């Protein structure tokens, strides 16, 4: 939902999503803006080529070795 939004609009979107969460709504969001995802999500599913490679809290998925390998690559020492 944040594609093409400026920083102010993204902040307003995050505030709106949080207001819905406080009211008890569950939100399914497909998004590539990781700042937005990490700031509003309680649980994240990470996909790579259509396959779920990790799920968990934001802290868990950013530390997951599969996520790091898929999105940041491996160092030369690991290959």
Positions of predicted regions on the chain:
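Glycine-rich phosphate-binding loops of nucleotide-dependent enzymes
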Residues: 1-79
């Amino acid at each position: 939902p944040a594609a093409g939004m400026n920083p102010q609009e993204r902040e307003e979107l995050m505030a709106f999503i949080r207001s819905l969460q406080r009211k008890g709504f569950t939100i399914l969001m497909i998004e590539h803006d990781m700042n937005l995802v990490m700031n509003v999500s309680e649980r994240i599913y990470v996909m790579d080529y259509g396959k779920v490679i990790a799920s968990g809290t934001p802290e868990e998925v950013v530390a997951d070795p599969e996520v790091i390998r898929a999105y940041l690559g491996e160092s030369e020492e690991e290959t």
